[in-house]
Amino acid sequence: MPLVSMKEMLIDAKENGYAVGQYNLNNLEFTQAILEASQEENAPVILGVSEGAARYMSGFYTVVKMVEGLMHDLNITIPVAIHLDHGSSFEKCKEAIDAGFTSVMIDASHSPFEENVEITSKVVEYAHDRGVSVEAELGTVGGQEDDVVADGVIYADPKECQELVEKTGIDTLAPALGSVHGPYKGEPKLGFKEMEEIGASTGLPLVLHGGTGIPTKDIQKAIPYGTAKINVNTENQIASAKAVREVLNNDKDVYDPRKYLGPAREAIKETVKGKIREFGTSNRAK
C-alpha cells in the first residue's frame, strides 16, 4: 500500500471516537517496530520524523526510501502516513514534501499570530496542491524535543485557534493545552475545557503532543473532545534504552549490535502495541 496523507485517517478517528498514534522514528529499528506493531494490530499509523531525526538518518529522502522499503519487505497493508514533526519553516516543509512526505507540521507557534497565519497559509497552499496534509500549532507545548525548547506551557487561545483554522485551511490543529515533550514532573494538567471549546468551534481533529506519561483516563477524556492524533516518542525511547542497558549489563562480552538492538526493537514494538490499544486504534485500518 502506498504512503497516504493523514487527513482521512484523522477524520475517521474523530467521527468514530478513537485516536491515531504518531510514533516518532529515530532509526531503522524504531521504524521496523512501529510498522510491525501497527500491522499486527491492524491499525493506521503516522510515522513522525523531526528535523533532528531526519538529519541523524541522513535526510528526508533517505527516511522516505527506508519506510517504503520496509513497507514492501514487511508486506505492510495498513494506511501509513509519514509526517514532518515540528517543521521549523516553509522551506523545511517544502523539502520534506518534495522528498515524499505525505504530511507536514508547520510550527510557527513562536511567531506573532499574524506571522503564524502567513507562514502556515503558504505551507498549506504548497502541500494541498500535492495531496499532503498539514498540521499547525498554537500556544507553547513545554519541554524539549530535538532543537525545539520551551520553558513553560502557554495555553492556546480558543478564538485564535478558530481564526487560524478559518484563515489557513489546515487539516488538523495542535493547540497547546498543558502537555509537554519529554518526561513529566508530576501529573500533567490538561485544559479539557479549552480542548472541548476548540474542538467544537474549529470542527477539526485535534492533536495532543507529549503523549508519553499522560494517564489513560485523560487520554479517554480527550478523545471525545476531538483529539484524534496523539504523539508518542519519549516512551519508546525509554523502553528502547532500557532494553539495550539490560543486555549490555548482563553480558559484558556482547559486541554484535543485533544482539542489543533486536531486544530494543521488541521493547518498542510492545510499547507501541500498548498505545494502539489505549488509543482505540486496533482494527481501524481501512
From Swiss-Prot:
- NCBIfam families, per database record: cbbA (TIGR00167), fruc_bis_ald (TIGR01859), PRK08610.1 (NF006376)
The residues that the entry says bind D-glyceraldehyde 3-phosphate are: 50
User: What taxonomic ancestry is recorded?
Assistant: Bacteria, Bacillati, Bacillota, Bacilli, Bacillales
Which PROSITE patterns does the record cross-reference, listed alphabetically?
ALDOLASE_CLASS_II_2 (PS00806)
> What does the entry list as the binding residues for Zn(2+) 1?
86, 181, 209
A single GO molecular function term of this UniProt record: zinc ion binding
Task: Please list the reactions this protein catalyses.
Answer: beta-D-fructose 1,6-bisphosphate = D-glyceraldehyde 3-phosphate + dihydroxyacetone phosphate
Protein name per the record: Fructose-bisphosphate aldolase
Q: Where does Zn(2+) 2 bind?
A: 107, 137
